[in-house]
Design a protein with these regions (language model features):
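Divalent-cation-assisted or electrostatically stabilized phosphate/pyrophosphate-binding catalytic cores
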Residues: 141
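Conserved catalytic-core motifs of GNAT/GCN5-like acyltransferases
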Residues: 104, 117, 122-138
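Acetyl-CoA-dependent GNAT
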Residues: 5-75, 86-88, 92, 96, ...
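Short acidic/polar active-site loop segments enriched in Thr and Asp
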Residues: 63, 99, 122
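Residue-level recognition of the GNAT/N-acetyltransferase active site
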Residues: 7, 73, 77, 106-108, ...
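Conserved acetyl-CoA-binding loop-helix of GNAT-fold acetyltransferases
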Residues: 78-93, 110, 114-118
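Extreme N-terminal starter segment of soluble prokaryotic enzymes
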Residues: 1-3
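Conserved GNAT acetyl-CoA-binding A-motif
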Residues: 93-104, 127
Length: 148
């Protein structure tokens, strides 16, 4: 597996993963274009030159970042790809001086919540009906400090 920068020409392949994993709640091409245009940090994980996962990080303030998303193709889940992407994002947050990292995760996504807990994220609250149109709640998690 190789982790590298997500570039504009990767967006169509990323959208295929988005559609499969998130259906009507998927991000659009314009959303990814916007993230890249704002200079946010986006990475892809590839195997045999195919994208198998991706993740993004945005700096909110000089010392605070948010994990925008992490997603792994269904047929490649449970292989450590999401963890590798998370480590990459956390390392970049530390390089940029972010000492507080925030993320939202669906309340019904226990595997992701467990991964985030292993990396020092703790629950901070619930955002009701965060994911639309399903109305699924999101658990907000926060990581303070720099130990990855």
């Amino acid at each position: 597996m190789v982790i590298e920068e997500l570039r504009w020409w990767h967006i169509p392949e990323v959208l295929t993963i988005e559609e499969d994993l998130f259906g009507v709640e998927k991000w659009s091409a314009a959303m990814f274009w916007g993230e890249l245009a704002r200079g946010h940090y986006y990475r892809i994980a590839t195997e045999d030159h195919q994208i198998v996962g991706y993740g993004g990080l945005a700096l909110l303030a000089p010392d605070e970042a948010t994990v925008s998303n992490i997603a792994v193709r269904r047929d490649h889940q449970r292989r450590g790809i999401g963890e590798a992407l998370l480590k990459d994002l956390l390392d970049e947050a530390e390089r940029r001086g972010a000492h507080r990292i925030v993320l939202e995760v669906a309340t019904d996504n226990a595997p992701a919540q467990n991964l985030y807990r292993r990396y020092g994220f703790t629950p901070a609250g619930i955002r009701r009906r965060y994911y639309q149109p399903s109305g699924t709640d999101a658990l907000t998690m926060i990581r303070k400090g720099g130990a990855s």
